[in-house]
Every structure is written in C-alpha cells, then in structure tokens.
C-alpha cells in the first residue's frame, strides 16, 4: 500500500484546494482499512476492536475536526461570498453529507457487530461518493471562483485549523494509519 502520501498537506507550495485533495487521499486510505474490518464483521470473523476504535477516532479527528472544519469554516463561506448558497446546491449537499457521516460514525461507536458492519458499508460508500463530488465538482469550481489572494487567505486559515488541533497530530495519525495498513 502507498504510505508516502503526506498527512500534513498544507505546505507553502500547495494551494488550499490541493491540500484538501491530499487529505482526501489519506481519508480514502483509512476507508480502505475500515472496509476490511467491516468485511470481517460481516463474515462473522473477529475484529481488532482497538483498530476499529482508532479508525473511528481518526475519522472524528482528521476527517471531521480537521478536514471538514476547513471546508465548513473557511472554504464554504468563501464560496458563499461568490454567490453559492449554503442551504442548497453543492454546498448544501456537502454539508448534509458531512452530517450524515458524523451520524454514521456515532452509530458505529454504539452498535453491535451487525449494525457496525452496516454502518461501515454506508459510511465508506458515502465518503467515497462525497470525495468524488468534491474533487470533480466543488474543488474545480472553487479554484475557478477564488482569486489568488482569497486562496492565500484560505491556506492561512487552513494552517490555523491545523495548529488548533495540536502539534504533530497529522504525523501521529499518518503513522497510526500506516501501522493499520501493514497489519
């Protein structure tokens, strides 16, 4: 498996949209591991509960408090200023899917094996489709609408989100994900 994708994609040479795409690549890797665990549950096989718990924390921390926070607090408002409505259209769909994903992760944390397996299937399908929509529709639109100055401000805002999550968080998450991919 590819473990060379950086988990700290907001770099001085990367656009904020490129940073979000890199984060999607990391999230897709974690979804692959989660999907394997879900398949084991569906097949009645034992599952490493610690690994499952770690993945749920990864999705809460990296996908939601880092990645979705950047979108919801920074990217989406920037796009709203260019006329995209928050309640409908692409932004409305993305926000609804973020909420649906949060509910599925909460459900996985509180469910029995059969319900976890079902929630895993739903979450993996939701996020893969969501990522595809953002990468192929929303992000190209953002790159088209946002000026260089707006993109620089967005990159700075993304850095602030990163700093608020604590030092070395992404490196620790990437190391943990790489361990799970190898196991």
Where are these regions (language model features)?
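Small-residue-biased structural context
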Residues: 1-183
């Amino acid at each position: 498996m590819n473990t060379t994708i950086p988990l700290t994609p907001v770099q001085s040479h990367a656009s904020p949209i490129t940073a979000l795409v890199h984060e999607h690549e990391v999230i897709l890797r974690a979804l692959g591991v989660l999907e394997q665990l879900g398949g084991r549950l569906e097949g009645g096989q034992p599952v490493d509960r610690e690994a499952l718990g770690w993945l749920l924390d990864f999705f809460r921390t990296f996908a939601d408090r880092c990645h979705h926070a950047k979108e919801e607090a920074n990217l989406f408002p920037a796009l709203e200023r260019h006329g995209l409505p928050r309640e409908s259209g692409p932004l409305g769909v993305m926000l609804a899917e973020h909420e649906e994903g949060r509910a599925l992760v909460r459900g996985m944390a509180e469910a029995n094996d059969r319900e976890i397996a079902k929630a895993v299937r739903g979450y993996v399908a939701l996020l893969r489709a969501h990522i595809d929509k953002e990468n192929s529709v929303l992000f190209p639109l953002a790159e088209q609408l946002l000026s260089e100055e707006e993109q620089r401000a967005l990159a700075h805002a993304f850095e602030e989100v990163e700093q608020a999550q604590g030092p070395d968080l992404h490196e620790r998450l990437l190391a943990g994900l790489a361990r799970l991919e190898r196991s």
